[in-house]
Curated annotation (Swiss-Prot):
This is Cecropin-B. Cecropins have lytic and antibacterial activity against several Gram-positive and Gram-negative bacteria. PROSITE patterns: CECROPIN (PS00268). It comes from the Eukaryota. Residues 1-25 form the signal peptide. Belongs to the cecropin family. It comes from Anopheles gambiae (African malaria mosquito). Keywords: Amidation, Antibiotic, Antimicrobial, Immunity, Innate immunity, Secreted, Signal. One of its GO terms (cellular component) is extracellular space. Its main location: secreted. It is found in: Secreted. The keyword Lipid metabolism does not apply. The keyword Transport does not apply.
Length: 60
């Protein structure tokens, strides 16, 4: 086995991963805010619909 080639390949991979500039956190933060808004909307819709569903089940 040629461990030298493997070592060089791993070293290059580590340098590429470490050398990459950190990406600005804004795009991920926007995604988090959108996800939070979606969760709030679903919660509010369920809160509004629950009495209607409970009343329908009570009648049936």
């Amino acid at each position: 086995m040629n461990f030298t080639k493997l070592f060089i390949l791993v070293a290059i991979a580590v340098l590429v991963v470490v050398g990459v500039q950190p990406v600005d956190g804004a795009p991920r933060w926007k995604f988090g805010k959108r996800l939070e808004k979606l969760g709030r909307n679903v919660f509010r819709a369920a809160k509004k619909a629950l009495p209607v569903i409970a009343g329908y089940k009570a009648l049936g």
